[in-house]
């Protein structure tokens, strides 16, 4: 399942945790970023305490609002590096910081070294890939000088199923590069919507 942009909507976030727990068929949850609005440490702690009520594993991406003030420090203290990856079954999930506008080029965003390291060290058991990020390519917060290069890297991974993102607070599905890789946008939690995906052995998904 995916949720995103929960900033300041604590009651709706509590509700989605209860709803996903009640389903009984969720393997894990990806939060698409912006759990804080102002990068205040207490915002991260309040949200973390809500997320810890999930009865399944969850991960949180770094959003652009999470970068404000000392927000990234709080994020790193609670969740770790904003570029990370994990494996579920034979699917590699690659989660990236794409909030380039929040940086002064002191850090590579997106981090192609991280992406290339993932590509070069994939287990032979990995058959499919999913990318998750807060901001999609061609949105102004993304470093659009490298948008097409980013997608070239994406397409080198085995059987990319789709890409996930948040940020714009609405639902959308787009083939951004006209290459068959769909980008799914998860709305903000105030819309009381989550996305649910089932990845099948035959390479299809619902």
Language-model regions, residue ranges each:
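Histidine-centered catalytic micro-motifs
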Residues: 131-137, 161-171
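N-terminal active-site segment of His-dependent metallophosphoesterases
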Residues: 1-46, 126
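Acidic-and-aromatic substrate-binding clefts and catalytic sites of carbohydrate-active enzymes
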Residues: 6-11, 35-42, 67-72, 104-106, ...
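Active-site glycine-centered loops adjacent to acidic/histidine catalytic or metal-binding residues
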Residues: 5, 33-34, 63-64, 134, ...
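Extended active-site neighborhood of metal-dependent phosphoesterases/phosphodiesterases
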Residues: 41-128, 148-159, 170-201, 205
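Short, histidine-centered active-site or binding-site loop motifs used for metal coordination
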Residues: 32-33, 97-100, 135
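Hydrophobic alpha-helical
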Residues: 139-151
């Amino acid at each position: 399942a995916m949720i995103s942009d929960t900033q300041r909507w604590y009651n709706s976030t509590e509700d989605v945790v209860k709803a996903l727990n009640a389903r009984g068929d969720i393997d894990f949850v990806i939060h698409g970023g912006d759990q804080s609005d102002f990068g205040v440490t207490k915002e991260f702690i309040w949200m973390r305490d809500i997320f810890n009520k999930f009865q399944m594993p969850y991960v949180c991406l770094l959003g652009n609002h999470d970068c404000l003030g000392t927000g990234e420090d709080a994020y790193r203290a609670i969740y770790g590096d904003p570029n990370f990856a994990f494996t579920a079954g034979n699917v590699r999930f690659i989660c990236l910081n794409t909030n380039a506008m929040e940086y002064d080029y002191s850090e590579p965003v997106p981090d192609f070294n991280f992406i290339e390291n993932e590509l070069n060290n994939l287990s032979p058991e990995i058959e499919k890939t999913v990318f998750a990020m807060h901001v999609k390519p061609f949105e102004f917060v993304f470093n659009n000088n490298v948008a097409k290069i980013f997608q070239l890297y994406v397409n080198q991974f085995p059987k990319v199923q789709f890409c996930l993102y948040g940020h714009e607070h609405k639902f959308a599905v787009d083939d951004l590069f006209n290459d068959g890789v769909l980008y799914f946008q998860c709305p903000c939690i105030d819309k009381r919507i989550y996305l649910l995906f089932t990845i099948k052995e035959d390479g299809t998904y619902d």
